[in-house]
Amino acid sequence: MACSWTFLWLLWIAMVAVLLFFLRGPLKISESLESVSATSYFNNLTPKFYVALTGTSSLVSGIILIFEWWYFKNNAGVEQGEDEGSDNEESIDNPKTVPECKVWRNPMALFRAAEYNRFRKETNSEPLTYYDMNLSAQDHQSLFMCDEDQGRAEYEIMQVAWRERESEQRIQTARTALAINSECASALVLLAEEDTETVAQAENVLRRALRAIENTLSTYSNNQIASYGQNGDTVRKRDLTIQTYIKRRLAMCARKQGRLREAIKGFRDLSREQSLSTLLSVQDNLIEACLEVQAYADVQNLLVRYDGYGTSCSYDQREPRSAAMSYTSALLKVRAVAENFRCPSESSVRRGLSSAEQTAIEALTRAMEFNPHVPPYLLEIRAMIMPPEHFLKRGDSEALAYAFFHIQHWKRIDGALQLLSIVWKDFVPKVNKDTHAFSSQLESADKELLPAWHEQSAFPQTESTLGMLIQTFACLAICILAVLSQQVPSSYGEMLRQIVTSGVQMYENSMNTFSQWAPNNIIPYLASKPVSVPEI
């Protein structure tokens, strides 16, 4: 910081010296110094001069104070973190490490045939990338297949079906497996996902698959004590996983068709199975469904259970688990004070913030630091597309996965989007990637998950120090020119012509100096291609 302000003062002195040099003619500085002695000059000064001098010095001091405060406000936290890290790096390891670009399955993923394919037919654009669909195929193989399936024709066929690239081939292969075994639940799941035109049709096929897997589970002994995670038969565990997956998709069908109580009951029943609900991220579905029925107390309890919201632990110091958790907790805090921000003006900010409003703004800022791509979609600044089947935490894909399903919850609370807009406008100039570790490969990895026609959101960039210095000196130069044009309007045009003439002369002198030591044909020589001379 000291180097920056040293450079600032040196540049200021140089600027004043250059300005006095160019104004020596119009202001007749040399004639004044020759004709008037220092003693007589100071004796002839009036009290108005001292008043103007005092006011000018106060103005300059105020400008310097404002820029110092601006600099410390934007950079004090970063420099303090760097100093503390350099002092303690020998004794304490830095806990903030850059996370890997791990791909997470979207728990709110849509149905391919009933929703994604309808979008493709309407817009003639592919909503999913091959990389995203390939990851889904790998997930289905890990969930619906096991090593004991060898020798069972229908399951061996389904192993091939999940690997097929084209949707028609997967559907035909699944129908072949159903021809062998009409109770093949994994084949029915594939057909429900990719061979139905509406969500209601997908629900009917999934209910058929649920009956089939329940019939299969009823054949096992001691089924009443079988649960995921115990030491038991691998095939039984696989079938329990299929049953949980089908129940989750059936609850999602109920949610999409407006049967909210049925959907919430289904998600709650699934959340009691800790291992499977965590694997499939059922809590995200349950939180979204509770927000739809405006059961905010239940949402708060879920956040306490899954993310530690509102507890006295070190929740504010650790990184949030997801954008859904962080923005939902912020939404609950915003809801308590959103009435004060219903008007789009910033009068509520000017009158001073209460403790509840300050807490809401801190929660929004913390959520934006985790994933700054979400607010432009919630505020409808950026065009939204259909969410991918997988996302990367802190990436544009996660922002789409959250905003696509939660934007109506923000619109339902009057004043929530107004407060979000105010905090977002204040957040962008002060954004800091170092608050939470940010992988430099995140944006390139997001391109693999999002369609090529989508304009990917970039991480907000902080304004560089050089840019702030240039803006500062440009502002000061404009102020000086405005004062000169007001005080000496007759000499102002002559001064501008002299400055332009001096600039042209400096350019001509530099070109003459360059041409003296450089050959005349240096430009054609540099522009020409090297010619290979054949050996004799």
From Swiss-Prot:
Pfam families: ST7 (PF04184)
Record has Metal-binding as a keyword: no
Subcellular location: Membrane
Coiled coil regions, renumbered to chain: 192-219
Record-annotated membrane-spanning stretches: 3-23, 49-69, 464-484
Major localisation: membrane
Domain of life: Eukaryota
Any one Gene Ontology cellular component term annotated for this protein: membrane
Bilayer topology term: Multi-pass membrane protein
Keywords assigned by UniProt, alphabetized: Coiled coil, Membrane, Transmembrane, Transmembrane helix
Keyword Membrane set for record: yes
Family from the record: Belongs to the ST7 family.
UniProt-recorded name of the protein: Protein ST7 homolog
Annotated source species: Caenorhabditis briggsae
